[in-house]
């Protein structure tokens, strides 16, 4: 019974495993030109559905509630979309001389280029008791920013423009991401009261569509006889991903707790999660667009598929520790305040 409850709670993680397993059993169903017609249903309909859903669920006022804390927002966005991908690129120059599969290494670079997720960083910040408003703003703002910045970073670091025209990427992104998002926000204005009363399962809808995208991505993988992935590379990539997450969490903690940083303990909590988490919901559709038709798309996507559950699991494990630190630091601040 406890196992069933756990499966129900972690249904998306289980769904990823099932989707990959189903793709392995019968990859012909989800390949381009197959019965599911992913070149239409995934590339356009599924991606547009995810972002229309995001437009419906995202409260516009959340983007302005924490707008005044410019220093915090600048720190998070620069770390996420500049420092993170650049550091990963430098690190990969060292790893390029190893025997690790080159497409997995390219996948690690794509992880660095991704924007923050809309949900997980906010959920963990709230669980700790950190600055939730800042987490909401930066997750939402970072997602919007990522629509433009992430494709540019992918083209810059991976040079995929040789196979996919730059204008083609942005036209498809505009039609499948920006337009549905804006339409979702417009529709939300007219049914706002109903949405707040009924609270539709937006997260479940987006995650379900995302599982379809993951399934068709791996159908392409398993139907390609040229792909060869050794277990050593896979295990090593998992170790590298966890090491990257821990290292960057420690870095953001050190930077944001300096005496002259100007950040509160609650701000630091939001910074730790928002600066180091990467979006799977935005990432996979973007990779599908930027690397459309690429024979190694699934290998490029694999590090992000590993990074996403790893960041949630690692963050969940660290919640009690970070919460204990924040509470003790806040008590210390109160005790050191001069009495009037």
Curated annotation (Swiss-Prot):
User: What GO terms fall under cellular component here?
Assistant: endoplasmic reticulum; endoplasmic reticulum membrane; Golgi apparatus; Golgi membrane; plasma membrane
Q: Where is this protein found?
A: Cell membrane; Endoplasmic reticulum membrane; Golgi apparatus membrane
Its record classes its membrane topology as: Multi-pass membrane protein
Instruction: Cite the GO molecular-function annotations of the record.
Output: bile acid transmembrane transporter activity; symporter activity
The role this protein plays is:
Involved in teeth and skeletal development. Has an essential role in the biosynthesis and trafficking of glycosaminoglycans and glycoproteins to produce a proper functioning extracellular matrix. Required for extracellular matrix mineralization. Also involved in the regulation of cellular calcium homeostasis. Does not show transport activity towards bile acids or steroid sulfates (including taurocholate, cholate, chenodeoxycholate, estrone-3-sulfate, dehydroepiandrosterone sulfate (DHEAS) and pregnenolone sulfate).
Gene Ontology terms: biological process: bone development; heparin proteoglycan biosynthetic process; intracellular calcium ion homeostasis; sodium ion transport
Q: Which residues lie on this side of the membrane: Extracellular?
A: 32-37, 93-116, 160-163, 223-234, 292-298
Keyword Glycoprotein: yes or no?
no
Instruction: Please report the name of this protein according to its UniProt entry.
Output: Sodium/bile acid cotransporter 7
The entry's family comment says:
Belongs to the bile acid:sodium symporter (BASS) (TC 2.A.28) family.
Which segments does the topology annotation call Cytoplasmic? 1-10, 59-71, 138, 185-201, 256-270, 320-340
Corresponding gene?
Slc10a7
Q: Which residues cross the membrane?
A: 11-31, 38-58, 72-92, 117-137, 139-159, 164-184, 202-222, 235-255, 271-291, 299-319
Location (main, coarse): membrane
Keywords, comma-separated and alphabetical: Cell membrane, Endoplasmic reticulum, Golgi apparatus, Ion transport, Membrane, Sodium, Sodium transport, Symport, Transmembrane, Transmembrane helix, Transport
